[in-house]
């Protein structure tokens, strides 16, 4: 899941979410099935590093949550808000568990591309960023802004933890046939992945150009919004959070 290491205190006890599952305690607890303890420890370390970084970047305390590493055979029984299970292999954040949980699949879906040493950690940090952002009510926003913030946060965490992104970013298709703003919500899984990758590239470029401070400003602005955020307002929020030169920089970016 990446090369982030940690040393959280370990705890093993029976977990109530799924029968037979145990729990690794620490700053980022992970509930896991028999036979996947090593994977659980790896996920815990990646999440602990991400949680500490996101807390500093956003200026907030980490949310109360734990990760649930689910065996492929148990995927249909994982906690969720919806009646139907999520597609196999797709991580997600849910409040259907107590505490809320990041649900992680034993086998990551093949739709996640590119596959590099950074893929696993980026996926975990992306879902963790959503959990941080959902600590407060968020307004409805265009899809590109809703997903850009966690992608940019993932890139910022990677920079803080020393996870090398160069190879991963080099393998991203920068010309998928659409921009972040023109992307259609009814695209297939491959299109959705191309959309997310485009936003990761844009988010990393923004952090490179303006530093990570704009992410705190943008997140807090979104938490304070009370109305639906339309396209024009979304662009203004992002540009203003970037600071001087933000509007001109955005206008020059092919991704947007």
Language-model features: where?
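Post-HExxH zinc-binding segment in Zn-dependent metallohydrolases
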Residues: 143-182
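Active-site metal-coordination segments of metallo-dependent hydrolases
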Residues: 138-149, 190-194
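N-terminal low-structure segments adjacent to metalloprotease catalytic domains
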Residues: 1-21, 254-256
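Surface-exposed patches in mature extracellular/periplasmic domains of secreted proteins
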Residues: 57-70, 137-143, 165-168, 215-220
């Amino acid at each position: 899941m990446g090369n982030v290491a940690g040393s959280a205190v370990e705890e093993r006890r029976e977990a109530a979410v799924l029968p037979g599952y145990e729990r690794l305690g620490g700053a980022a607890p992970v509930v896991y099935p028999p036979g996947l303890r090593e994977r659980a420890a790896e996920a815990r370390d990646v999440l602990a590093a991400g949680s500490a970084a996101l807390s500093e970047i956003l200026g907030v305390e980490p949310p109360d949550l734990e990760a649930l590493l689910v065996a492929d055979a148990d995927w249909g029984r994982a906690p969720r808000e919806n009646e139907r299970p999520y597609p196999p292999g797709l991580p997600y954040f849910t409040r259907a568990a107590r505490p809320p949980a990041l649900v992680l699949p034993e086998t990551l879906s093949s739709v996640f591309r590119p596959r590099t040493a950074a893929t696993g950690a980026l996926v975990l940090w992306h879902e963790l960023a959503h959990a941080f952002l959902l600590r407060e009510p968020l307004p409805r926003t265009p899809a590109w802004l809703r997903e850009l913030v966690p992608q940019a946060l993932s890139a910022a965490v990677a920079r803080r933890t020393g996870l090398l992104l160069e190879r991963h970013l080099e393998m991203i298709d920068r010309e998928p046939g659409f921009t972040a703003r023109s992307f259609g919500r009814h695209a297939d899984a491959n299109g959705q992945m191309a959309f997310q990758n485009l936003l990761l590239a844009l988010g990393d470029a923004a952090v490179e150009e303006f530093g990570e401070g704009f992410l705190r400003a943008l997140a807090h602005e979104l938490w304070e919004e009370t109305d639906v955020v339309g396209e024009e307002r979304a662009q203004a929020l992002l540009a203003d959070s970037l600071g001087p030169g933000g509007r001109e920089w955005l206008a020059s970016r092919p991704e947007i």
